[in-house]
Amino acid sequence: MAKLNIVLFEPEIPANTGNIGRTCVAAGTRLHLIEPLGFRLNEKEIKRAGMDYWEHLDVTRYIDFADFLDKNPGAKIYMATTKAKQVYTDVEYEDDCFIMFGKESAGIPEDILVQHPDTAIRIPMLEEIRSLNLGNSVAIVLYEALRQREFEGMKNEGQLTKYEWGSRQPGQERNLTEQRLAAEQGSSHGDAQG
C-alpha cells in the first residue's frame, strides 16, 4: 500500500486532531504534527475523537516547520489552503508526498505558501464561506489521493451483519413501513373516538 503523509501545521483543536488521526489509521496514512500544538496529545478530547485507533497511529512531532523540512529533505509538499489557485483534484499525488493543512484559526502562513506556488491546492466552496472544518478538509483531499490509487490495499466492499445483499425484495421495507404507519393511524383514530 502506498504511503501518504498528512501534515497539520500548529493544530489548535484536539477533537479535530483526534478525528484526523482516526482517518489516517483507516487510510494507512502517516500523521505529522508541527508544533506548537494548541493542546496536549494526552487530552481526552483527542482520545475520544480518535477512539481506540489512536494507539495504531503512525505519528511524528516536529518543534517547528524548519524541523519538519530538516527531517523530510526533498519532500513534495502540497499546501491545502483557501488562498490557492488550483483545485485539489487537479494534481496527481505521488507516493510518499505530504499534504499539509494549517491551523484552524489562520491556515498556513503566507510566507510558507509563497514558497510552494505549484503545490498549493484548494477545496472549492461558496465564496461567502471562510473555510471548511479541518477534519473534513483532510478527509476530502486524502480520499482523492487514495482514489487516484484506486484505493490500493483498502477494503472496498462491506457486508451486512444480519442480511446478505440482495436477499430482500426491493421495496419490501417500504411496504412494511407503510403498513406500520397505517396501523398506528388506525389505533390513534380509535383512541380519539373512544
Task: Name the predicted role of every residue range.
Residues M1-G194:
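Post-transcriptional modification and biogenesis factors for structured RNAs
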